[in-house]
Amino acid sequence: MSPTQCPEEDVITAEKATYSSITLHRRCPQAWKYRYIDGLRRARSESTPALDFGSWFHAARAADRLAKGRAEGTLKVELEEIQTTDTGPTFPGTVSPAEIISASQDYWDRLGETARETWLDWLGQPLPQRLAHIYAEWRERWAEESENEAVIAVEQRWEREIPGTGVTLWGYADEVYQDRKRGIVVVRDCKTSGTLGQVTSLDEMMDSQVQLYAWGLSPDCAEWSLPAPRAVAFDRVRSKAPKTPKITKAGKLSASVKDYDLRTYLDWCADGVPFEGMKKDGSAAGTYMAEEAEIERLASPQVVSQWFARHLTPVSRYLVRSHLQAAADTCSDISRTRVRADRRGEAPRNFGKAACQFCEFADLCRAQMVGGPGGEYAPEEYGLRYRDPSHSGR
């Protein structure tokens, strides 16, 4: 995008913002103040499996892609370290996926019994078992596509100013790669979630995060003598473990359990599954073996997409322009929030169930609305903590 295509109407007090900062301010300026001015966070907990499993898988995935880039000589930037969770280990950038999966066992063993139960309730399997399973399945699912991809960078930091605004955006891209067949550079975002819902190409085109990342990485690509990113890719992975198949007395697969993948099915019936039959004398008993029809069903794109899904979406300069204008406008609002917070000790609040129901700062916010912003409020009494001292206030 050329400077003449960028928003220039507003000159904003210099702001340096991430996508997360912008979206939180859009949700509620007061919540933004708690996080980015006061430096508050939710108190650390051993029981955040949805977030922490995603961090562990991202770490194994990053190690895998870095190794591919090194082996093929396409990697432009080395990653110094790979992080897992707040309470988990940090690895050197040269770590292997196998080492990360092995370390997850030590992490799992250190969790308290209550925390492990919470993990099992949500994930369906112990962390090490699920991580090993999903990583193996992910590699197998995308092995053919991976041959067509030249890994350029992993967890790549970018920073770029929106011309004429005083706003600098920055962030980290999960992966930058070159599609060898299409001859284009692609920015990829990896997301883990409990289950994979239906996501359309339009939904992903309107996801400003990765579209902005493609724009932000254009100068880096130029330094690497590569063209600007032409597309963004989404790599979606289901976190929750597959169920174990069940069999009826008659030796048929139970219709009550269908939420399993091919690997789980084949492992389950590898040695045969005995069934007692419907006759009292046991004459109808037998052993269930893998069915070709079930294997074909589980290998079908429709079923596989319930566990792993990828989409490629073109970068639109007009869409990027719209997102940049929106980002600049939000940063203008952020500048005003800083002034109001400095003068009054609080920011505007977006009241409403959607904004407040699941807000991590809701209890503190309610207390300050009653007692005023100038009182003494210990964060730990509201399930919060201060971030580390290096917090920049941005």
PLM region spans:
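Short acidic, Pro/Gly- and aromatic-enriched capping/linker segments at domain boundaries
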Residues: E8-I22
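Nuclease catalytic cores
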Residues: S21-G69, P128, E155-Q156, K353-D363
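Short loop/turn segments at secondary-structure transitions that flank enzyme active sites
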Residues: A31, L40, A63, A67, ...
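Mg2+/Mn2+-dependent nuclease catalytic core
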Residues: E149-D329
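Surface-exposed helix-capping loop/turn segments at secondary-structure junctions
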Residues: A67-K76, E145, D220-P227, S335-F351
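A non-catalytic, helix-rich entry segment at domain boundaries
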Residues: A59-E155, E161
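Cysteine-cluster motifs in flexible loop/terminal segments that predominantly coordinate metals
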Residues: C6, R27-W32, R263, C269-E296, ...
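Short amphipathic alpha-helical segments and their helix-coil junctions
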Residues: V11, Q30-A43, V187, S193-G197, ...
